[in-house]
Regions:
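Conserved acidic-Pro-Pro-aromatic motif
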Residues: 134-141, 181-186, 192-239
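Structured loops at beta-to-helix junctions and adjacent beta-edge loops in soluble globular domains
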Residues: 70, 79, 167, 214-216
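Conserved protein kinase catalytic core
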Residues: 121, 146, 172, 195-197, ...
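S-adenosyl-L-methionine
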Residues: 1-142, 147-152, 161, 174-181, ...
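Short, surface-exposed basic-aromatic patches at helix termini and helix-loop junctions that form
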Residues: 128-131, 154-157, 202-206
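Conserved SAM/SAH-binding loop
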Residues: 165-173, 190-192
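Structural motif corresponding to alpha-helix initiation and N-cap regions
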Residues: 97-100, 169-170, 195
Length: 239
């Protein structure tokens, strides 16, 4: 049986939405409502599709720029490397807001932002636009993301204040002037590679830095052991 075929004549189908001259967004909504009602096993996927659709609509309505929050005015080109579902919360200034607020509340002497896993520059550029940071250093593995990041930096008028580097390895700190690490904050988000990237040597070199690490221990079978090892490595220099 076709999954969109009604079980009885009284049941609405996604196609009915088209007959009522509904908007594209409304048609998508009706379709997903039908899926959730008749195929609950598909619900997680349907919710994610709807979330992405709404997010894209919010992003387009605000001219593809952040409209609220500390990064207000941040413009990002099409081709974002983040998921579609993140665009809306970025636009509303809610994307990882607790992390943003925490970074902005750091002592004012910290004016250098370093990011490993910079993607398109939401943090690296946004923090410069906030007026809180003077410069950013962004490590990004993907060549396409680095190109988009460079374009976004020019788009927002901060290209002269941002340094874009390639993939960070365990000795990434050697690419930075030690003087640049004295009044800096480091954000690491590399989808599970943090356990291979950060060790005793890097924590020692970054002893004067505030460090934020997005942990992905759950992606590794031995995630708990990796997490414990990371804690031991940083215990001498960071709390």
């Amino acid at each position: 049986m076709d999954p969109f075929q009604p079980k009885d004549k009284g049941q609405r189908t996604p196609g009915d939405a088209l007959d009522n001259n509904l908007s594209y967004a409304q048609t998508i909504g009706r379709t997903l409502e039908w899926i959730c009602r008749n195929h609950p096993e598909w619900t997680p996927a349907a919710v994610e599709v709807r979330r992405a659709e709404l997010s894209r609509w919010v992003w387009q309505q605000h001219g593809q720029q952040v409209a609220h929050g500390p990064f207000k005015g941040l413009r990002l080109m099409d081709g974002l490397q983040w998921g579609e579902a993140d665009k809306g919360v970025m636009c509303l200034g809610l994307y990882e807001r607790e992390v943003v607020d925490d970074i902005l509340a750091l002592p004012t002497r910290i004016t250098h932002f370093i990011e490993i896993g910079a993607a398109d520059g939401y943090y690296g550029i946004g923090l410069l636009l906030s007026g809180r940071f003077q410069r950013s250093t962004c490590f990004e593995t993907e060549a396409q993301s680095r190109q988009i990041l460079a374009h976004n930096a020019r788009l927002n008028g901060v290209a002269a204040r941002i340094r874009i580097l390639g993939e960070a390895g365990p000795s990434f700190h050697e690419e930075l002037d030690p003087r640049d690490l004295r009044d800096a904050v480091l954000l690491v988000d590399v989808e599970g590679r943090e356990f291979d990237l950060l060790g005793e040597a890097s924590f020692l070199a970054l002893s004067d830095c505030v460090i934020y690490i997005e942990l992905h221990d759950w992606v590794h079978p031995d995630g708990m052991q990796r997490l414990e090892r990371l804690r031991r490595c940083c215990s001498a220099t960071h709390t």
